[in-house]
């Protein structure tokens, strides 16, 4: 008769009994075809309830260690193919995780937004109301392109803010632009050559390459990406950020925009991916119209995100597809689920449609404008003109500062990091072979502490000049 000590377990008795019997089967102590005691007999022998034995037997039968024969009882199954592998009590895993953000570092390179200005009370109010009013919709599966209400709100916002006349059905919502880039590769094909701006975000080319697409960096001139070099690369897809390029800050003039459209119109398989990231924060004058607004031949795919205008952790982005590509998307890729929760989609839809988003943008534009001037004033106070030069543009939340130093860019970065300051050179964003040091560094001011800026600038001055 089977005998086990079940008194040393902290969990349910049936689990302990199940483990004991399973171990005996795995180690060959109970042979294939051997008959097991009845539930009542084993329960009486172990001093437990019949239901405890029944639950243990059911678990073993469910996993294939035992089987039952009507009116004959329970038997051990043939588990001879199972290899007994003893798991170590403790094992040190060698998984190397990326380093976490060091919050003590004064980071001039971070593109995070100023979290202190997020409208928490309004967002919480809208989310509570959404949960109260939309119980059924919240628990329903979202359409693959996003809920209708959010797509309509985005279309209305694009019409009033960017002068774009788009149908809500052209809009595809996703959790972050990285996800949308991956969808675009699947939609446009891996047989195309994708070109990206150089210098630029390395992540964009990494995403294309991870999706098995050929991606080539194309050099920029003072007007943006070079159309002549796009032609030499034999590219079909041009991924650009014409409104405010990162990191150079270049705003593409209208003649270059028409030149790009002319290139795209030369072949049916050519498209422009217009990344309008950071376009909301133009400090002077009216926002520059996107290329899509002057596209008459459906050659532009427009992409934008709410991670800069609201907060970095709101992973809601969207793209606007030409009509024929929207049809192709729904025909071939509609099996993809929308990656944004319905809770966030309905809340953001109301945040936009009820005017809160426009008010927030206006308030943040004023806030960042003042912060920009404060940072520029601090730089002017800390550095004579001969020691540094600010290269700025009227839009976006960063500018470039050029130091008169003999130190290599890499050395500057390393020395300052040792003193708790993170500063990134423009050469850090070169996608092709690095050029000679330019001593130009990015000042991303959206999330820096303005009260500490003077102290940090003086440390920079003492370290590299």
Where are these regions (language model features)?
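N-terminal basic, amphipathic alpha-helical segments
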Residues: 1-128, 139, 324, 334-341, ...
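Short glycine-rich anion-binding loops that position phosphate/pyrophosphate groups of nucleotides
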Residues: 113, 243-245, 308
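Short, conserved active-site loop motifs that form the nucleotide-linked donor/cofactor pocket
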Residues: 270, 300, 387-388, 421
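Walker B catalytic acidic pair
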Residues: 275-276
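Conserved core segment of the aminotransferase class I/II
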Residues: 296-366
């Amino acid at each position: 008769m089977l005998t086990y000590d079940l008194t040393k377990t902290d969990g349910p008795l049936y689990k302990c009994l199940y483990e004991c019997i399973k171990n005996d089967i795995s180690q060959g102590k109970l042979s294939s075809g051997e008959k097991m005691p009845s539930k009542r007999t084993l329960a009486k022998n172990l001093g437990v309830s019949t239901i405890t034995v029944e639950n243990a037997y059911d678990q073993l039968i469910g996993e294939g260690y035992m089987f039952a024969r009507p009116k004959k009882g329970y038997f051990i199954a043939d588990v001879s193919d199972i290899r007994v592998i003893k798991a170590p009590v403790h094992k040190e895993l060698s998984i190397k995780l990326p380093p976490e953000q060091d919050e003590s570092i004064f980071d001039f390179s971070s593109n995070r937004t100023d979290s202190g200005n997020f409208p928490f009370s309004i967002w919480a109010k809208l989310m509570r109301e959404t949960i109260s009013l939309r119980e059924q919709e919240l628990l329903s599966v979202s359409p693959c392109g996003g809920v209708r209400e959010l797509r309509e709100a985005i279309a209305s916002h694009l019409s009033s803010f960017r002068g774009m006349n788009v149908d809500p059905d052209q809009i595809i919502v996703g959790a972050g632009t990285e996800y949308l880039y991956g969808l675009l590769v699947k939609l446009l094909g891996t047989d195309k050559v994708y070109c990206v701006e150089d210098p630029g975000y390395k992540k964009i080319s990494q995403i294309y390459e991870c999706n098995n697409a050929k991606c080539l960096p194309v050099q920029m001139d003072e007007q943006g990406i070079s159309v002549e070099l796009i032609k030499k690369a034999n590219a079909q897809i041009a991924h650009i950020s014409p409104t405010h390029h990162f990191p150079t800050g270049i705003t593409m003039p209208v003649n270059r925009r028409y030149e790009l459209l002319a290139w795209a119109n030369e072949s049916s398989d050519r498209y422009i991916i217009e990344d309008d990231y950071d376009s909301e924060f133009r400090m002077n004058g009216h926002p520059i119209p996107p290329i899509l607004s002057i596209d008459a031949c459906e050659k532009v795919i427009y992409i934008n995100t709410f991670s800069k205008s609201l907060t970095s952790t709101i992973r809601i982005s969207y793209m606007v597809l030409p009509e024929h590509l929207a049809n192709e998307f729904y025909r071939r890729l509609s099996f993809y689920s929308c990656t944004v929760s319905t809770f966030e989609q309905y809340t953001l839809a109301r945040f936009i449609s009820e005017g809160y988003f426009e008010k927030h943008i206006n308030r943040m534009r004023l806030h960042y404008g003042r912060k920009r001037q404060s940072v520029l004033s601090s730089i002017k106070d800390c550095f004579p003109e001969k020691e540094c030069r600010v290269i700025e543009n009227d839009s976006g939340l960063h500018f470039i500062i050029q130091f008169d130093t003999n130190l290599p860019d890499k050395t500057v970065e390393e020395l300052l990091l040792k003193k708790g300051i993170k500063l990134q050179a423009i050469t850090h964003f070169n996608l092709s072979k690095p050029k000679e040091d330019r001593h130009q560094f990015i000042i991303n001011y959206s999330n820096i502490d303005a009260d500490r800026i003077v102290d940090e600038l003086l440390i920079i001055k003492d370290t590299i000049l």
